[in-house]
Amino acid sequence: GLNLPAGVPEPSASLVAGGNSMDVLITILDRYIRNGLMRSESGRDHALAEDAKSKLRMLGVQITGSGPRLCASPIGRVMAYASAKYDALRDILSAEMQTLGPDIRSVIVTDFEKTSATALVEGVLDDDAGGAVAAYRAVLGCETTDRLDPVLMTGTTVLVDDDLLERIFPRFEQWASERSLDIKFDYIERGDYFEIRGKGKDWLPRYYTMMITEMFQEGVTKCLVGTRGLLGEGWDASRINVLVDLTTVTTSMSINQLRGRSFRLDKHWPEKVANNWDIVCLADEFTKGFDDYLRFKRKHKQLYGVCDDGAIEKGVGHVHAAFTEVEPEGVSETMEIFNEEMLLRARNRVRTRDLWGIGQPFSAVPREAIEIKGVFGEGFPPANRIGLAAWSDES
């Protein structure tokens, strides 16, 4: 590289490391590709530009005529829909079952019913990775969570646990008969579960969603798996006390609509506290291996939550105070500690309810706040270290 001009001090190691961040490098590469290579008269430069743009797309950046734009990256897709998330899903449901017992009402929400893997991630992701069907199979695949008798419902499909069929199928027929609906039910075995099919003009999502939701409220099934299109805004089930978000949406409206599903008063449990879960996959060996964690931070940028000190805070700090400052690499290194703490916290719903201070006076006006931490080791305040008056009775 070039030497620094005379009189310019050597930069610190942290400054050099910051200059190698993806944001800085993308800005430099974008200008070099668009203003240098693409405007060159050399065919070799044009070929190099296309090669560079192709490689940047792998990192989730598309170079356009007007500048860089974010796009889906293969590694980001792998992180979002990794099968390792299903191990965490089973751990979460098992912990919640131990705490809530027969009162558990869990809902698992995904983006799609099935997601087909693209050619770029072929052989890495399953054909239906990240979809509702894959999550449903994961719940059935564990002896503990299989006892929840899960049901999957989307806009086109209804699946029922094989252990549940004998009990729930007659209830389906009874429900339709009591409402004089034109539905003739049938089922097809699909291994560990059955696909419910219906014929007649009333076999529509609006009716079978109402029917299955009613069974869920009663506890015939204690776990629903579905898509955010069906289990999002407009769907209501007051008894939900566990919500697992496997979606990739980060917009304010979608996030608040989804989390709002569990914010319903339950007449059977006046002291109800619902746990909303995010499952995050990290892989520090990849350049884009923290995409899922960064998406998690964007989600909580739109959400309020209670902190350990009872403050209602908007941002990822209400999930864990360490997330406010710690870099993704630090989260990855201490992942097991965070996981253990979250599972322990989930078991203590009484404390969570106390932290919210339900029924106590509060101000509904949001305020911005700056957290200042002293690092001088001389107590409060450290004013004498920044050129202000020293702490005394007079000052």
Name the predicted role of every residue range.
Residues 121-124, 166-168, 238-241, 258-260, ...:
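Short, glycine/charged-enriched secondary-structure capping and boundary segments
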Residues 209-217, 224-241, 254-265:
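SF2 helicase motor core recognition
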Residues 1-223:
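Conserved C-terminal RecA-like helicase domain
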Residues 330-395:
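The feature captures the C-terminal accessory region of ATP-dependent helicases
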Residues 113-115, 157-159, 230-232, 248-251, ...:
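Conserved nucleotide-binding/hydrolysis micro-motifs of P-loop NTPases
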Residues 109-110, 226-228, 245-247:
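Short His-Asn-centered micro-motif
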Residues 237-238, 250-256, 263-345, 357:
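A conserved SF2-helicase RecA2
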